[in-house]
């Protein structure tokens, strides 16, 4: 059931592309808040679009314009396609010209209603705590295990996540580097950081190298690196407030099976505040083993092959 708000003051960015059904679903949720400052962006078409893609892009724009008849928000339509390595940077930079904080949603992330209030409260509470740079609405641990990390309504991680999130202008403008110009200078310090595990160092060395070689097109890994390099904390809700639906219908980016079918649950207010502003070892170990420990993933594949029934059968035949 949707809750009606008098006015939601925190700025919201909604990035769309060519998902008309998803765009309409999420836009309705946002508009129910009566947002005072909503910015709806649509990236331009790529060259070589199919007829279906062209129609989906056109339909998405029509939906954005349709709701403007009854609601007030700013819509920005780019005529040309912006590189995936710059789109996030460009739209956030645009909004930060006039605001000191923002909530960001993409068109494949369906939020629970409480997501917006949660982000707004966290943005206000930790505004002056410069050790915290990112607020996430996605909790992959709860989404996959249906369990909470602790008895509080939020906790802290070293890993920022982007399926519904928020941040402040001062952190973003100071630390986000869309081109990773300082990577070569910072590389030695990063690799010698005793607080980082070998898997994290291997992961970022691999993917930042690919990004610098223009073999990886993205705008978010730069912020993940900035947060980890500067030892920033991310606030996460005790439950998962975001369902990613983009992995089912022609996703913009490459999906992962583990993102599918994540359980969501709305958060209750007032929040039980967490006085312990330290990294959650349990959550960070969960993400490390699932995403950042590339060697561990490789070994799991090897072990799966090694102990498969086919492999056992071959070994048995060879020994006879």
Give names to the regions the model predicted.
Residues 5-104, 109-320:
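An acidic/histidine-cluster motif and surrounding catalytic segment
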């Amino acid at each position: 059931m949707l809750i009606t708000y008098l006015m939601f003051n925190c700025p919201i960015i909604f990035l769309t592309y060519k998902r008309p059904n998803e765009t309409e679903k999420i836009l309705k949720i946002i508009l129910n808040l009566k947002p005072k400052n909503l910015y709806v962006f649509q990236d331009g078409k790529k060259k070589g679009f199919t007829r279906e893609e062209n129609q989906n892009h056109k339909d998405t724009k029509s939906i954005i314009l349709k709701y403007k008849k009854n609601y007030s928000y700013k819509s920005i339509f780019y005529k040309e396609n912006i590189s995936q390595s710059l789109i996030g940077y460009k739209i956030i930079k645009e909004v930060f010209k006039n605001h000191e904080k923002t909530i960001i949603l993409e068109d494949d992330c369906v939020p629970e209603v409480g997501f917006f209030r949660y982000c707004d409260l966290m943005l206000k509470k930790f505004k002056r705590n410069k050790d915290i740079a990112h607020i996430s609405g996605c909790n992959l641990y709860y989404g996959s295990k249906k369990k909470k990390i602790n008895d509080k309504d939020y906790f802290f991680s070293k890993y920022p996540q982007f399926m519904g999130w928020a941040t402040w202008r001062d952190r973003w403008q100071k630390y986000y580097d869309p081109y990773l110009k300082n990577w070569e200078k910072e590389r030695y310090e990063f690799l010698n950081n005793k607080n980082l595990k070998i898997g994290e160092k291997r992961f970022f060395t691999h993917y930042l190298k690919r990004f610098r070689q223009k073999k990886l097109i993205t705008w978010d890994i730069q912020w993940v690196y900035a947060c980890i390099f500067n030892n920033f904390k991310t606030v996460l809700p005790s439950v998962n407030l975001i369902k990613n639906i983009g992995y089912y219908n022609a996703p913009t980016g490459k999906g992962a099976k583990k993102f599918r079918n994540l359980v969501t649950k709305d958060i209750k207010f007032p929040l039980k505040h967490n006085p312990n502003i330290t990294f959650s070892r349990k959550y960070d170990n969960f993400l490390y083993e699932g995403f950042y420990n590339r060697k561990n993933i490789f070994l799991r594949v090897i072990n799966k092959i090694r102990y498969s029934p086919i492999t056992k059968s071959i070994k048995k035949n060879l020994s006879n």
